């Protein structure tokens, strides 16, 4: 059975700080390629969104991921924050579309369940598990850890989907 190495970019969008994490995945093994944060300037929102889109597109062109994964929008009590997060998410989706990447979306609960084993895990628990799972020298910043967790969730989820498809093929 052929298990090609896939490169996945995970994106944790935010209007001020957008985290990114790029991993490789082959079979049940994963490793870290790059991670970081896009910290936007204190410009007006349209310039911050453009910066997010431009920097993500540059990262995609440099690292050439095969797939992208992003966190689904969740409900906010603050509607202004929700709107800004949705706009930052839109900028990230435009960057992936410009580079012809397919995008998978996962809820925060799914991501935490996949990485920590508990859907209500704290940010610190996610950060710690990402550090351990990817054998990083030190724990990444919270936004980058979340992005790496999103990429890990996608690697796990897509691997499971492939196995289910293979099993289904042998049953018919």
Curated annotation (Swiss-Prot):
Q: What does this protein do?
A: The RuvA-RuvB-RuvC complex processes Holliday junction (HJ) DNA during genetic recombination and DNA repair. Endonuclease that resolves HJ intermediates. Cleaves cruciform DNA by making single-stranded nicks across the HJ at symmetrical positions within the homologous arms, yielding a 5'-phosphate and a 3'-hydroxyl group; requires a central core of homology in the junction. The consensus cleavage sequence is 5'-(A/T)TT(C/G)-3'. Cleavage occurs on the 3'-side of the TT dinucleotide at the point of strand exchange.
GO MF terms here are:
crossover junction DNA endonuclease activity; DNA binding; magnesium ion binding
Enumerate the cofactors the protein uses. Answer: Mg(2+)
Which proteins does it associate with, and in what oligomeric form?
Answer: Homodimer which binds Holliday junction (HJ) DNA. The HJ becomes 2-fold symmetrical on binding to RuvC with unstacked arms; it has a different conformation from HJ DNA in complex with RuvA. In the full resolvosome a probable DNA-RuvA(4)-RuvB(12)-RuvC(2) complex forms which resolves the HJ.
Keywords tagged on the record: Cytoplasm, DNA damage, DNA recombination, DNA repair, DNA-binding, Endonuclease, Hydrolase, Magnesium, Metal-binding, Nuclease
The answer to whether the entry has keyword DNA repair is yes
Q: Does the keyword Transferase apply?
A: no
According to its UniProt record, where is this protein located? Cytoplasm
Q: What is its EC number?
A: 3.1.21.10
Domain of life, per UniProt, equals: Bacteria
Q: Which PROSITE patterns match?
A: RUVC (PS01321)
Binding locations of Mg(2+) 1: 12, 143
Q: Which organism is it from?
A: Coxiella burnetii (strain RSA 493 / Nine Mile phase I)
List the InterPro entries hit by this protein, alphabetically. RNaseH-like_sf, RNaseH_sf, X-over_junc_endoDNase_Mg_BS, X-over_junc_endoDNase_RuvC
Catalytically driven reaction(s): Endonucleolytic cleavage at a junction such as a reciprocal single-stranded crossover between two homologous DNA duplexes (Holliday junction)
Q: Name one GO biological process term.
A: DNA recombination
Q: What EC class does the entry list?
A: hydrolase
What positions does UniProt annotate as the active site of this protein? 12, 71, 143
Record's Gene Ontology CC terms? Answer: cytoplasm; Holliday junction resolvase complex
- What is the protein's given name? Crossover junction endodeoxyribonuclease RuvC
Similarity comment text for this entry = Belongs to the RuvC family.
| Cofactor annotation remark | Binds 2 Mg(2+) ion per subunit.
Which CDD domains does this UniProt record tie to the protein?
RuvC
> Cross-referenced SUPFAM superfamilies, in alphabetical order?
Ribonuclease H-like
Q: Which gene encodes it?
A: ruvC
